[in-house]
């Protein structure tokens, strides 16, 4: 009787330890994933010859990227919809 109680208690302790370990791994997973994503150098700004959306521009000059146009009113590049 004592041996079976001891085995049951040891099994419960083992179950709690495994559950705690899996929960801590689940909590660390999003942090590891984000650190791997943002460690890539893809997010560094690249210099380009044209100005993209919401960049300041001078109306009349062709400074904006293709499919963008310089707004006369706001003086920034906006998406050109063909109007």
From Swiss-Prot:
Q: Where is it localised?
A: Secreted
Indicate where the modification Leucine amide is found in the sequence: 81
Which top-level group of life is the source organism from? Eukaryota
Positions of the propeptide removed during maturation: 22-48
The set of disulfide-linked cysteines is: 50-65, 57-70, 64-77
PROSITE patterns xref list:
HWTX_1 (PS60021)
One Pfam assignment: Toxin_12
Q: Name one GO cellular component term.
A: extracellular region
| Transmembrane stretches, start-end | none
One of the entry's Gene Ontology molecular-function terms is: sodium channel regulator activity
Keyword list (alphabetical) reads:
Amidation, Disulfide bond, Ion channel impairing toxin, Knottin, Neurotoxin, Presynaptic neurotoxin, Secreted, Signal, Toxin, Voltage-gated sodium channel impairing toxin
According to its UniProt record, where is this protein mainly located? secreted
> Signal peptide: which range, if any?
1-21
What tissue specificity is annotated for this entry?
Answer: Expressed by the venom gland.
Q: Enumerate the InterPro entries for this protein.
A: Huwentoxin-1 (IPR011696), Huwentoxin_CS1 (IPR013140)
Q: What does this protein do?
A: Lethal neurotoxin. Selectively blocks tetrodotoxin-sensitive voltage-gated sodium channels (Nav). Does not affect tetrodotoxin-resistant voltage-gated sodium channels or calcium channels.
The subunit structure is:
Monomer.
Return the domain comment text from this UniProt entry: The presence of a 'disulfide through disulfide knot' structurally defines this protein as a knottin.
The protein's name in its UniProt record: Mu-theraphotoxin-Hhn2k
| Natural source organism | Cyriopagopus hainanus
